[in-house]
Every structure is written in structure tokens, then in C-alpha cells.
Curated annotation (Swiss-Prot):
This protein's domain notes: Consists of three domains; the N-terminal catalytic domain, the editing domain and the C-terminal C-Ala domain. The editing domain removes incorrectly charged amino acids, while the C-Ala domain, along with tRNA(Ala), serves as a bridge to cooperatively bring together the editing and aminoacylation centers thus stimulating deacylation of misacylated tRNAs.
Similarity comment: family membership: Belongs to the class-II aminoacyl-tRNA synthetase family.
PANTHER family per record: ALANINE--TRNA LIGASE, CYTOPLASMIC, ALANYL-TRNA SYNTHETASE
Documented EC number(s): 6.1.1.7
Gene Ontology CC: cytosol
Cofactor section: Zn(2+)
Domain of life: Bacteria
Keyword Nucleotide-binding among record annotations: yes
Species classification: Bacteria, Pseudomonadati, Pseudomonadota, Gammaproteobacteria, Cellvibrionales
The name this protein goes by in its record: Alanine--tRNA ligase
Keywords noted in UniProt: Aminoacyl-tRNA synthetase, ATP-binding, Cytoplasm, Ligase, Metal-binding, Nucleotide-binding, Protein biosynthesis, RNA-binding, tRNA-binding, Zinc
Gene symbol of the encoding locus: alaS
Catalytic activity: tRNA(Ala) + L-alanine + ATP = L-alanyl-tRNA(Ala) + AMP + diphosphate
Positions annotated to bind Zn(2+): H562, H566, C665, H669
Any GO BP: negative regulation of DNA-templated transcription
Length: 875
């Protein structure tokens, strides 16, 4: 049974049991900033389990793509060396949100695994574990399912504390938690290992294939376990593991999904040993890298981007170990698309952009490896002992982008170890500096409890009647807010838009009987809108009647920019290509900022075409239409989703100019495109590998930018005594004149320097047969300084010459030593000596070197010290 068939069978089975099939969410969690990557099927349902999100269904099933590399769940180091560790895997899951519980969950799992209609795994090949205190689950397995008691294993608190067990799951130190039951497959006596709970449980004979979690309790801060009013179920089964069972192989790398990738990796690396562990690493890593790039992650030196960079570079290094020194990793994307493109069409859509990102990173890594190895080899040559200092490790990472695990690989090959304590200390210092210089946004709902949900009416209203449902101060629930206090007010109904989809939250006021609250920002927390601000007068209590009033001018200006962003996105795709996808945005009342995927700077003529296309749509004054529908219908309309945004069952489709722009969006917009008035692109830049950024303004601000440009043009024309129409000709004429003057000045300086150099010949001091000369000259450029040095050196014969010149408070140094004197004194050493005394640095070859410095006052003494220094060197 092929992996794709198992995936589809699982989803069909649970659909037959009343579950809604839910598509895999992005690998970048949209609802949990504490997670680097989606690492389990339940992540996209976390808010549902917490009661902060409502769905139209109470049962769900999914095949969720997951990554475990970096953070708490990190399998990277084990990948390729074990049969079952992966950076990327698919998690098959079924979920109950206060619907069915233990009995149905256990019976569903057993039926799917063992019934002839589905997987038909022999029951004698399976055993199960339950939490030691979970008599209910034990009884269901023994009495309802009929599993022999000798194959039901109770697992207690085996991790050092109460409820710390392989069979007890918790979302965190507090919150939803409960026992779990796990199903294990016996690969047979020929494989070493024992049953769960035995000393040999870490062997590979008994492998967990399905974990069924019962969210039964809510753990409080003091450790009290209170039963949840609506117990839920969260299950997970690794597709790769169950595929190994169904395909009668022991290692996940032997299943159909991996065999094609291993063959492609062997061809790309020209590896002769088809069983090499490095091929496993490469085959695994192409999956995680391709899906991460498809989900908007790009290589960088921090966060998710750095984890991606580590995975790419680890794969490339394993290719190098197999003898492949040319870029190869990006060529494997085609094989992956062939294997998984049908299940994940986004791979097909993004194939070209994924290949370009990986190829660019391979090229960058080749340069990094070359530079980093020079630094590392230099450090190793001076190493005393077997421990590479933390400072070296940190410099390699921080300055050269050299991953620590790569340094560790090289160290291991040379039987060396790393000073990780020293590295960690330096890294913590850097993080501290970043924290001190950075800014952050307060999580106002971190510890608060907010009941109910806010009804948003802001699409059609800017004011209305409401009641206060909660008040928060410093993240804690309070009953009253007094004059002058800052805090958060939650209403049952609001016209205030909460920040999401790149659009800033609304501002304005909330008016009460005898009180007024200034809304400085509006954020979303689950199903509630948090009005953040300060009480200007009076006092407010929970339950008070309120009249929220949105600042209409700010809302309208924001709407102009948001609608313009949609038109800009569409124009970018039409001009640059379909590979362009949104990578982020910021829309407020002042401007719009749009980040998108593209692999080179946008050419000026392309920017002009894009801007013109958007303005054409604005002039057409097309209606802006919204429609509510399900996700499937939206996708059929060709609607594009926003990066990093999560969507419910019902989505809002926004169309402009007919089919010109169709996107999913919950933001506020204009009624017709003509309301935007005008767009003006103010900048285009690169912010990361493969990501560009456009900033623009609309409406009156666009007119202001155009007026300012015209004012600057007129002022420049007046200054240069030309008309605006003839300004370019005038500037070109002045540039030509300036070039001619510079040539004349350079010739005069060279002539002056030449005559001065002749006068200095007599000032050279003979030291053991070497004529040494050190001089400082005024206002000579670097080229003239080199010419002077060459002339002096040639006329002096066996000599060592160093010259210095000051220009714009910066000192230039140049030194030359005749070939017959380099065994006694070196130009690089001369420059280093003087540069060290003037707050600079320098170096070069034995016969020629350059440098510089900034301490102009110290220069005379530094030049004066050269003779004594040279005597000490030459002897």
C-alpha cells in the first residue's frame, strides 16, 4: 500500500465517521508565536481546544505537514543516522472538540488499523500503553476492543514527577492536559528491543505508530487538576511510520516516498554507495527545505530562516562528503514534486521559486565555506589542546554565517570538541544587546481570562452601542479602570478593526456616561477585540454601557492603502510573474509596505509599469466587491491567501477590477478603486534572500510626494540656472567639466609629488644596508601616494619606504620594500606598526602593503617612530 493511498484511506475513514477533512496548515504557525514550526496536527486547532476559536464542526481529520528542527522538538542531529528521525514528516490525525471521547477514539483507531476494509494489520502485531491511573482507557482496551491484558501496558510517572509520563500529555505547565494511550507495532523478534516500559524499550522492535491524547483536565498554577467541561481528543500517527508497517520494511527510508528521493540524491551527488547515511540526510532535508520555502520561510541568520539555512547547509555538506562539490541540492526539488505534488499542489506552484532559493543558498554557502574554513583553519593552527574556543565558534557563526553544527562536524572529524559554554555566553550577550535595543508588543491577554466574543460590525459602522465585558491592566482582569490609567477594554460589540492581515488596528474613542477612553490601538485575541489605550476622564466598570467611535479619517486613509496593496500585489504578479507571492505587509493610515518573493531587484522600467498598471485600475473606478464563502469555493475563484494568516470555515473574498485582483481578506477597504485616487511607489529594496519590499503612498500623500519632487526639481533647476526641461543637459555638462578638472588636479598633484619625492631621497637613513624612509604628506590621494612610493623605492635601490597622507580626517598609508630587502623587513609589518599607533589597521605582501587610520594628531609621532622600529627589526 503506497503512502499516498494510506493518507487518503485515513482521511476517508474518518470522513465516514462524521469528521470534516481539514487541509494541512502552514509550517509557520499562524496562532502560536512560541512555536518555530508546526510540529503536530493539533497546532492549527490549538485555539479551538482552548475555547478561543469556534468552528462549524466538532470532529476533524487532517494530514498535517510538520517540521521538527530547532527549538524544543529538534530531530536534526539524528536525521540520517536512525530509522525514524526526520526533519519533515506528515502527521495523520483525528480530533474531537467536546464531541466523542475515549471509547470512540480508541475504537476508531483500532478499527482503522485492524479491519479488513482498511489497513488489516494483524492484531497480534499490536500492543498498547495507557497511563497508570487511567482505568477507563484500560477497561475500553480490555473489555470493548478485546486486547489481551498481557498486551496492555500501564505506564506511570516515568519522567521524574507527578504527571510527568510518556503517557500523560500537557499543553504547558498550566492549561489543558490529560492521559494518552499509544499503539505500538511489533516489527518482530529479529529486531532488537523490548516492549514499552522495559529496559530495552529504546530498541527498534516495538515502534509507536499512533498516539491518542485525552484532554481531560485543566491544570491550575497550584497544580490542581479540574475536569474540563468538554473533554476533547487529539491524535497523531506518523505517515512514514505506518507506511513502513504497511510496506513491510523496518526503516522509514525504505518506504516508497523516500526510495525515489534517495535515487535522485544518489544521481545528483554521483554517490556509489547507495546505502550511505549522507543520502538519507539529503533525501530527508529536501522535503523540509522545499516545504519551508513554499510556506514563506527564507534562509537568514535568525529564527526560522536560520533553521532553514542550517538544514540546507547540512544537506550540502553531506553532498560534499559524498564527493559532490558542485551545486546539486536544488535539482532534487523536481523529484520531490513528482512524489508529493499531487497531495500538496503548492509544491508544483512554487517549484521554480523553491529551486532558485535553494540554488542561491548553495552559492552563498560555497563562499561562506571558503571564508569560514580559512578562519577555522587559522584558529586550529594556533590551537593548544583539543577544545575549540567559544569565541572562535561565535565569530564563525556571527560574522561568517557558519552554522555551529557544521563547526561541530569538522571538529568531530578531527577529534576535537567545542567550548559550547563560551559560545552560549557570547550568544546570550548578543541576545541581551538585541533585547535592550529592540522593541516589543505587550501580550495583553497573557494571563487574563476573557469570556465570550466580540461582535465586529466595522465593515458597515464606525460607531454604535456596546457593553464592557472585560477590563485588563498589565494582562490581569480588573473590575474598574480609573482616570489616567492605561489598559485594555473588551466590548461585546465593536466597529474597531483589530490588527490582522497586515492592517493596523483602528484608533478613536470609547465614550461612556461621564468617562472617555482613548483607543490607541486595537488588537485581536482569539474571538475578542482588545481596545488598547488610556482612560482620559471618569471611571469605567465591567458591564458599563459604551459608545465606541472609530477615527473615520484614519480608517479611510488606511482603507486607501489596503485596497492599493491588493492592486499592487496583482500588478506585481502580472509584470514580474506568477512566482510572486506575498511574504508580509504593513498597512496603516500613512503608507503601505508590501514584501514579496522575487529573486532580483525590480528594474526601474518594471516599477514604472507596475505603478502605471495600478493607477489604471484606480482610474477605471471599478467596484470593490466582497463575498462570504467556504475555502474550496474561494480557491475555485482563484483567491490568493495572505501570508501568515489563518482562516476559518467561512472566508471573505475581496475582488477588484473584476478578476484583476481576487484575494482572501478580512480587512477594511474602499467602495470603488477610484476612491484611492493615486498611488506613488516611494522605494524598492531587498530585505532578505529572495524577498523584495515596495513602499508606497496613496491619495493626498501621493500628491504630496509628487509635489515635493516637483519642488526639488524646480529648486535644482534654479540653482543651476537652467529650466526644468533642460536640467539633465545642464547636469551632464557640469559632470563633464568636473571630470576634466579632476584630471587636471590629479596631474598637478602627481607633478608636485614627483618633485617632492626627489627632495626626500637625501632624507633616507641607511640601516644595515637598507635605506629606510618614512614621510607624511598633505592632500595626496591614494594613487598619487603609491606612485610616489614606487618612485622613491626605485631610486633608493635596496630600501623600505612608508608614506602617509591625510584627506578628510582619514589617514592613508602605503609601504613598499625592494625585493632584495624583504628578507630583512616587510611592508606589511611597517604598515601594521604605524596603523596601530593611529587607531587603524592594515597589511599586505612583503613588498607592498596599505592601511589607514583616524587619529590625525598621532600621525607625526607614528611616522617619527619608524626609524627606531626599523632598527629593531633589521638589527
Amino acid at each position: 500500500m503506497k503512502s499516498a493511498e494510506i493518507r487518503e484511506a485515513f482521511l476517508q475513514y474518518f470522513e465516514s465517521k462524521g469528521h470534516s477533512r481539514v487541509a494541512s496548515s502552514s509550517l509557520v504557525p499562524g496562532n502560536d508565536p512560541t512555536l518555530l514550526f508546526t510540529n503536530a496536527g493539533m497546532v492549527q486547532f490549538k485555539d479551538v481546544f482552548l475555547g478561543q476559536d469556534n468552528r462549524s464542526y466538532s470532529r476533524a481529520t487532517s494530514s498535517q505537514r510538520c517540521v521538527r528542527a530547532g527549538g524544543k522538538h529538534n530531530d536534526l542531529e539524528n536525521v540520517g543516522y536512525t530509522a525514524r528521525h526526520h526533519t519533515f514528516f506528515e502527521m495523520l490525525g483525528n480530533f474531537s472538540f467536546g464531541d466523542y471521547f475515549k471509547k470512540d477514539a480508541i475504537n476508531y483507531a483500532w478499527e482503522f488499523l485492524t479491519s479488513k476494509e482498511w489497513l488489516a494489520i494483524p492484531t497480534e502485531k499490536l500492543c498498547v500503553t495507557v497511563y497508570a491511573d487511567d482505568d477507563e482507557a484500560y477497561g475500553i482496551w480490555a473489555n470493548d476492543v478485546g486486547v489481551p491484558e498481557d498486551r496492555i501496558i500501564r505506564i506511570g510517572d516515568n519522567k521524574g514527577g507527578r504527571y510527568n509520563s510518556d503517557n500523560f500529555w500537557a499543553m504547558g505547565d498550566t492549561g489543558p492536559c490529560g492521559p494518552c494511550t499509544e499503539i505500538f507495532y511489533d516489527h518482530g523478534e529479529h529486531i532488537w528491543g523490548g516492549r514499552p516500559g522495559t529496559p530495552e524499550e529504546d530498541g527498534d522492535r516495538f515502534i509507536e505508530i499512533w498516539n491518542v491524547v485525552f484532554m481531560q483536565f485543566n491544570r491550575s498554577v497550584d497544580g490542581e487538576m479540574a475536569p474540563l467541561p468538554k473533554p476533547s481528543v487529539d491524535t497523531g500517527m506518523g505517515l512514514e511510520r505506518i507506511a513502513a508497517v504497511m510496506q513491510h520494511v523496518h526503516s522509514n527510508y525504505e518506504i516508497d516516498l523516500f526510495q525515489a528521493l534517495l535515487e535522485a540524491a544518489a544521481q545528483a551527488t554521483q554517490a556509489e554507495d547507495k546505502d550511505a547515511k549522507s543520502l538519507r540526510v539529503i533525501a530527508d532535508h529536501i522535503r523540509s527545505c522545499a516545504f519551508l520555502v513554499s510556506d514563506g520561510v527564507l534562509p537568514s541568520n535568525e529564527g526560522r530562516g536560520y533553521v532553514l539555512r542550517r538544514i540546507i547547509r547540512r544537506a550540502v555538506r553531506h553532498g560534499n562528503k559524498l564527493g559532490q562539490t558542485k551545486p546539486f541540492f536544488h535539482t532534487l526539488v523536481a523529484a520531490l514534486v513528482e512524489q508529493m505534488g499531487e497531495a500538496y499542489p503548492e509544491l508544483v506552484r512554487d517549484q521554480a521559486s523553491i529551486e532558485k532559493v535553494l540554488a542561491a543558498e548553495e552559492d552563498q554557502f560555497a563562499k561562506t565555506l571558503e571564508k569560514g574554513m580559512v578562519v577555522l583553519e587559522s584558529a586550529l593552527s594556533e590551537l593548544k589542546g583539543t577544545i575549540i574556543p567559544g569565541e572562535v565558534i561565535f565569530t564563525l557563526y556571527d560574522t561568517y554565517g557558519f552554522p555551529v553544527d557544521l563547526t561541530n562536524d569538522i571538529a568531530r572529524e578531527r577529534e576535537l570538541t567545542l567550548d559550547m559554554d563560551g559560545y552560549d555566553a557570547l550568544m546570550e550577550q548578543q541576545k541581551k544587546r538585541a533585547r535592550e535595543s529592540g522593541s516589543f508588543k505587550v501580550d495583553y491577554s497573557a494571563t487574563a481570562t476573557i469570556e465570550g466574543h466580540t461582535n465586529f460590525v466595522g465593515y458597515s459602522e464606525l460607531t454604535g452601542d456596546a457593553s464592557v465585558t472585560a477590563i485588563l491592566v498589565d494582562g490581569e482582569n480588573v473590575d474598574t479602570l480609573t482616570e489616567g490609567q492605561s489598559g485594555v477594554i473588551v466590548l461585546d460589540t465593536t466597529p474597531f478593526y483589530g490588527e490582522s492581515g497586515g492592517q493596523a488596528g483602528d484608533t478613536g474613542y470609547i465614550v461612556f456616561d461621564g468617562a472617555k477612553f482613548e483607543v490607541q490601538d486595537c488588537q485581536k485575541s482569539g474571538a475578542n477585540h482588545l481596545h488598547v489605550g488610556q482612560l482620559l476622564a471618569g471611571a469605567v466598570k465591567v458591564g458599563d454601557k459604551a459608545q465606541p467611535v472609530v477615527d473615520s479619517a484614519v480608517r479611510q486613509a488606511t482603507a486607501l492603502n489596503h485596497s492599493a496593496t491588493h492592486l499592487l500585489h496583482a500588478a506585481l504578479r502580472k509584470v514580474l510573474g506568477e512566482h510572486v507571492t506575498q511574504k508580509g505587509s504593513l498597512v496603516d493610515s500613512e503608507r503601505l509596505r508590501f514584501d514579496f518573493s522575487h529573486f532580483e531587484a525590480v528594474k526601474p522600467e518594471e516599477l514604472k509599469q507596475i505603478e502605471s498598471m495600478v493607477n489604471e485600475q484606480i482610474r477605471l473606478n471599478s467596484p470593490v466587491e466582497t463575498e462570504l464563502c467556504d475555502m474550496e469555493a474561494a480557491q475555485q475563484k482563484g483567491a490568493m491567501a495572505l501570508f501568515g494568516e489563518k482562516y476559518g470555515d467561512e472566508v471573505r473574498v475581496l475582488s477588484m477590477g473584476g478578476a484583476f485582483s481576487v484575494e482572501l481578506c478580512g480587512g477594511t477597504h474602499v467602495s470603488r478603486t477610484g476612491d484611492i485616487g493615486l498611488i506613488r511607489i516611494t522605494s524598492e529594496s531587498g530585505i532578505a534572500s529572495g524577498v523584495r519590499r515596495i513602499e508606497a503612498v496613496t491619495g493626498e500623500k501621493a500628491l504630496s510626494v509628487i509635489d515635493a519632487s516637483a519642488d526639488t526639481l524646480n529648486a535644482a533647476a534654479k540653482l543651476l540656472k537652467a529650466s526644468p526641461e533642460n536640467l539633465l543637459d545642464k547636469v551632464e555638462q557640469l559632470i563633464a567639466q568636473n571630470r576634466q578638472l579632476e584630471k587636471s588636479l590629479a596631474a598637478a598633484k602627481s607633478k608636485l609629488a614627483s618633485s617632492s619625492a626627489d627632495e626626500w631621497l637625501s632624507e633616507a637613513t641607511d640601516i644595515a644596508g637598507v635605506k629606510v624612509l618614512a614621510k607624511a604628506v598633505e592632500g595626496v590621494d591614494a594613487k598619487s601616494l603609491r606612485d610616489m612610493m614606487d618612485k622613491l623605492k626605485n631610486k633608493l635601490g635596496t630600501s623600505a619606504v612608508i608614506l602617509a597622507s591625510v584627506n578628510d580626517d582619514k589617514i592613508s598609508l602605503v609601504a613598499g620594500v625592494s625585493q632584495d630587502a624583504t628578507s630583512k623587513i616587510k611592508a606589511g609589518d611597517m604598515v601594521k606598526h604605524v596603523a596601530g599607533l593611529i587607531g587603524g589597521k592594515g597589511g599586505g605582501r612583503p613588498d607592498m602593503a596599505q592601511g589607514g587610520g583616524t587619529d590625525v594628531e598621532a600621525l607625526p609621532a607614528a611616522i617619527g617612530s619608524v626609524l627606531d622600529w626599523a632598527k629593531g627589526v633589521i638589527g
